[in-house]
Amino acid sequence: MELLFDVGNSYTMVGIHQDGKFLTWRIGPSSFESEDGLFVIISNLLNRVNVDLNKITLAGISSVVPNVNFILEQMLKKYFNVEIIFVGTKNKINNIAYLVDYPKEVGADRICNVIACKQEYGDNVIALDFGTAITVDVLEGGNFVGGAIIPGFKTAIGALFSRTAQLPKVEIKIPEYHLGKNTIDNIQIGVIKTTLYGIERLIDEIKRERNKDFVVVATGGDMSFLSSKISIFKHYDPYLTLKGILYYSKEIKKL
């Protein structure tokens, strides 16, 4: 049994992998104030679903928030008898080369996404991860060849709210029309629809530039309630990043 952590900017996804299935929970940044407090939160979550902590043999971690890594690692060392593995580009997993200017700068979440994509969807895949930032990651010929980073929906809406005097903070929703008749509609159309249209155009241009078709896979918390309403991707995989953490950790354990 594996315990997995996808540490993001807005929240951390905690996952248990057992018998080919994932159980997941979200915890907020305040959960990482101390190693003891973090253990209480994690153990309570696992106890609710009758997970025997002694049967967990591996902890895999993808983190884009370095300042929580120490507390997380210390908690695991103190309370779990597990091998702890952090995701990074140092080890070549699934024979993926990172053909970019600075491979060490590629985020752990993006590494996990391309590893999972290659494992499950093939050598030519575009991964879209809708979170605090929207990442576009391109796997071509089985290697990571680049991508893009875009402000996430909540990030963009939050920026409008914090930097203007009268614009409200609105929920993430896709209006059925393209001309807003009130402020909320205007923001939703302006932020969400134009972002999605921009990503769709970007994907088309990547395909044209590389002269290749790609399977498009989406993941991320902000996509869970929009996946049935848009068609810019072929697959929605809510566990894509966790799968990547799992594949990475198991391969490292073999070394």
From Swiss-Prot:
Note on how the cofactor is bound: A monovalent cation. Ammonium or potassium.
Coiled coil: none
Residues annotated as binding K(+): D129
Binding-site residues for ATP, renumbered to this chain: D6, V7, G8, N9, S10, Y11, T12, M13, T132
Active site positions, chain numbering: D109
GO biological process, alphabetically ordered: coenzyme A biosynthetic process
Statement: the UniProt record of this protein carries the keyword Nucleotide-binding: yes
Keyword set, alphabetical order: ATP-binding, Coenzyme A biosynthesis, Cytoplasm, Kinase, Metal-binding, Nucleotide-binding, Potassium, Transferase
A cellular component annotation (GO) from this entry: cytoplasm
Top-level taxon in the UniProt lineage: Bacteria
GO MF, one example: pantothenate kinase activity
Catalytic activity entry: (R)-pantothenate + ATP = (R)-4'-phosphopantothenate + ADP + H(+)
Gene3D superfamilies membership: 3.30.420.40
Cofactor: NH4(+); K(+)
Residues holding substrate: G107, A108, D109, R110, T183
Enzyme class: transferase
Subcellular localization: Cytoplasm
InterPro entries, sorted: ATPase_NBD (IPR043129), Type_III_PanK (IPR004619)
Pathway: Cofactor biosynthesis; coenzyme A biosynthesis; CoA from (R)-pantothenate: step 1/5
EC number(s) recorded for this UniProt protein: 2.7.1.33
Subunit: Homodimer.
Family according to the record: Belongs to the type III pantothenate kinase family.
Name of this chain's protein: Type III pantothenate kinase
Organism: Petrotoga mobilis (strain DSM 10674 / SJ95)
